Amino acid sequence: MHDFLIPKDKSKEEKYRNIVSQIDSLVEGESDIISVLSNISAAIHQTFRWLWVGFYIVKGDELILGPFQGPVACFRIKKGEGVCGKTWLHRKTIIVPDVEKFPGHIACSSQSKSEIVLPIFKNKKTYGVLDIDSEELNTFDRIDQQYLEILVGIIERKLIDNS
């Protein structure tokens, strides 16, 4: 077992530095990607207390709900629809300061106010996305993007190692 010990009085960047090293060691040696994604979503959710942290996995022409922490979520998202679908389509991170102002936003939860979605790649193809929602406006910034992309890199290495 592994306990996550992230002091609450640390800055966002210090929390990220801490969680990156802990997640890296947590997933070391685990070959099942669903288990890896499950614990990563739990660790991020536990550390930052955001509304929703989870993964959608590409299956055919849809993103299918994967491991997550938070309220009940949408099961399927089409390519190009909502923030997750647009992240898949454009293959780049999208930060949404106010989801009400994002054209085509899919409201899986009425509590969501801001969002960040990052693509996950396997062999140059989109494997899925990491989706994080907050109950506050303007939650996510470049610091979040920088460190969450490092965490996505850990996932991508696991996908390649376990091919």
Describe the function of each predicted region.
Residues H2-P7, D133-L151, K158-S163:
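Regulatory loop-to-helix N-cap segments in sensory/regulatory domains
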